[in-house]
């Protein structure tokens, strides 16, 4: 590449970057987080939210999509932590395939036809039971939804499908979502495997992704 073409490319790239910075995002917002880079540890989204004393969700009715993997680096579960905050009201817990606590999911109490979490008193909804979407009546009670779950890094997991359905429902009800991210356990650097055909799209292949999606 000649020097002239290289300079033109750099200028174009710079203008594209400036335009992207000015436009930012239409539906998303950037939240300032504490600088923890001086610690030689991994901090998940839940750890960061705890560092901010959960200010983003205080004085709000929240729904949480999680399972047993939603723990801090000190192995404290999100439901145990938030259950101690009087100014955070957990209205609903959305559980994925296998439930909140895996196959041994007997901790929720059955009161009438409703399942209740004994720690927070929140109503529990399994997104794989009957309807793949949460009920409209509970969505109308929520101010924000928090998602914290460790995915597997492969397409066959239904977690990403349930999250997508939750996003679709939240969009219909104009409810903001906070995603507490976690690292890909099989790393996000490698992509492997074929793409599914559209005619075979299912809940185990809701998105047209390779088996190992990165």
What are these regions (language model features)?
Residues 1-32:
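Bacterial Sec-dependent N-terminal signal peptides
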Residues 102-106, 178-201:
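Glycine-rich, charge-decorated loop segments at or immediately adjacent to ligand/cofactor-binding or catalytic sites
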């Amino acid at each position: 590449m000649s020097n002239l073409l290289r300079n033109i490319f750099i200028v174009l790239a710079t203008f594209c970057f400036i335009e992207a910075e000015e436009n930012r995002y239409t539906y998303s917002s950037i939240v300032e987080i504490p600088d923890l880079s001086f610690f030689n540890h991994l901090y998940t989204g839940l750890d960061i939210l705890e560092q901010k004393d959960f200010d983003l969700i205080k004085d709000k009715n929240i729904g949480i999509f999680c399972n047993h993997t939603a723990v801090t680096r000190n192995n404290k579960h999100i439901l145990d932590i938030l259950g101690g905050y009087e100014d955070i009201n957990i209205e609903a817990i959305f559980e994925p395939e296998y439930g909140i606590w895996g196959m041994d999911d007997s901790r929720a109490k059955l009161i009438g036809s409703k399942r209740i979490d004994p720690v927070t008193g929140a109503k529990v909804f399994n997104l794989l039971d009957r309807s793949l979407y949460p009920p409209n009546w509970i969505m109308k009670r929520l101010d924000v939804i928090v998602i914290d779950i460790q995915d597997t890094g492969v397409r066959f997991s239904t977690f990403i499908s349930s999250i997508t359905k939750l996003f679709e429902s939240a969009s219909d009800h104009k409810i903001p979502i906070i995603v507490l991210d976690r690292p890909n356990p099989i790393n996000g650097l490698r992509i492997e495997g074929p793409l599914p055909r559209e005619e075979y799209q299912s809940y185990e292949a809701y998105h047209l992704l390779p088996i190992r999606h990165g």
